């Protein structure tokens, strides 16, 4: 903010009245004659409704098209699509029924340890590692609250937890002129609270 040419206060208090207020962000963009909006990280960065609102306002959303975000911004929707395409996926539950009873039955079927994940957003919010069934109910309550506060949605998915797995990413960047570049793999396995702390490239276990 200190390095920005212009800074606008979009609100104080809960994020629902500031960083999650789509209309307010677009209004500020128009007031400052901005041509594009970069969503940043977390909050609305993976919200397809925000990307669509930016597009409809005649501004450029720096990121994927709203249709792509709608597909990939929801872990439950994207995982269903991958399973339909027969892409190998971690065993889990990504159904519409979000009742405690259904999630409990699904958790027992998946087995422990397992991860509770917010279907929307990322950044480690709305995630809980559950090692035994007795801890599941409280973990679901906490994860739902975190997800709702951070992303505006309390929808959750469950996945089998692989404790000693590596987190490897490959990033692709494209522009509006059909140019595409990819970066070498990054090892993001060193984490704190399910959030990357260090990214190593190239990965020491792959190169």
Name each model feature, range by range.
Residues 1-207:
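N-terminal beta-alpha lobe that positions the nucleotide/phosphoryl donor
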